[in-house]
Amino acid sequence: MDIKNLSLKDIKFPKSWETKPSKIEYMQFVYQEAIDMKVWRKDNEIDILTHHHVTDLSRFFWPNADFEGLVLGAELMVWFFAFDDLFDGGFIDDNENEQYRLVNRMNKVFLEGTIEDDSTGAERMGYYLRNKVRAICGEKRQSTFHRFNSSCVQWVDSIIPFIKLKRNQKSLDFNLYIHHRKFNIGAIPCFLVSEIILDPMSNIECFIWLDSRWIKMSEIICEIIALVNDCVSYEKEIKENGAPLNSLKFIQIEKNLNLQESFEYISNYLNELINQYIELETSFIKSYKPITSNYNSNFIAIVEHLHNMSFANVSWSTQTPRYLSQTQPFLELRRNKKIITKIYDLKNK
């Protein structure tokens, strides 16, 4: 693949959306939890590096959270990876019956609060996460708990349809892809974790988060995160499998564009989304400012976190070894992979 000089700076995020990641002390705690639930294999080098990669997102997504908040975010990331890897890691290949069986079992974890005797590590982490969120929310915050559960079920249910898109890749349409991907990216459960972390006393009226503008704002951020992920993972996916479900790739085919033109198309689309989001956010905050005066700081923190997460995804992507290489088409990712040796001596803790 020819090296291009593309830049993520062509995506015009407002300066106010930028954040700095927090510290990493929570990683060891969550690693031990995942070992106990048999999500990871103890002292396995691959699992240790995977754990760092997966849980590192928490400090970028929730930079202002306390230790418990960072742990909750990291647990969610481990669950995402552990379940998705059953499908992406080649464990069940194209066995559709097994795919539906795993989806139905995981849905029962969140819908019924039950777990099978022969549970997988992903199911154990999901069960633990569900019960933990329920305990945190208590009786006063049942709406938050149920919306978190619903968002997790929605993500689980998105996996098989997204797999099926791969089988129809020759006729893949950008709008169809975006519709599926904004749920499959897994950002909506993250938004609910933000609400749990940033409004601990549940002072904010729950109906506010049912406003159609807030729901649309959430979906826009999902789209932004999904498309940025396609950009930063483009080279990696091309090398691994030809990137059949990468928008930067299939837009080239669909519209007969080169890589530069395809990225220009996506960056323009992203910039339109950002502008649309800003308009909605301004209207949303203005509408509820009079009734949120008693807890305005929490309300604003949750709203700001929604857009901050989209830039945090960019920040994380430009430093994770997962995407760095000397042949990256994106200038911000074009350097040697970092060797993770001093993050945590997880084997000896």
Swiss-Prot record:
SUPFAM superfamilies: Terpenoid synthases
Motif (NDxxSxxxD/E motif): 229-237
Group of enzyme by EC: lyase
Catalytic reaction annotation: (2E,6E)-farnesyl diphosphate = (3S)-(+)-asterisca-2(9),6-diene + diphosphate; (2E)-geranyl diphosphate = (Z)-beta-ocimene + diphosphate; (2E)-geranyl diphosphate + H2O = linalool + diphosphate
Induction: Expression is detectable but at low levels in vegetatively growing cells and increases during development induced by starvation. Expression is highest during slug formation (approximately 16 hours after induction). Expression decreases during culmination (from 18 to 24 hours after induction).
E.C. number: 4.2.3.-, 4.2.3.161
Keyword line: Lyase, Metal-binding
Pfam families: Terpene_syn_C_2
An MF annotation (GO) of this entry: terpene synthase activity
Lineage: superkingdom: Eukaryota
One GO BP: sesquiterpene biosynthetic process
Functional description taken from the UniProt entry: Terpene synthase that converts its substrate farnesyl diphosphate (FPP) into the sesquiterpene (3S)-(+)-asterisca-2(9),6-diene. Is also able to convert geranyl diphosphate (GPP) into a mixture of monoterpenes including (Z)-beta-ocimene, allo-ocimene and linalool.
Family, as annotated: Belongs to the terpene synthase family.
Domain remark text: Contains several highly conserved motifs that are important for catalytic activity including the aspartate-rich 'DDxx(x)D/E' motif and the 'NDxxSxxxD/E' motif, both of which are involved in complexing metal ions to coordinate the binding of the isoprenyl diphosphate substrate in the active site.
Protein name, per record: Terpene synthase 2
Protein species of origin: Dictyostelium discoideum (Social amoeba)
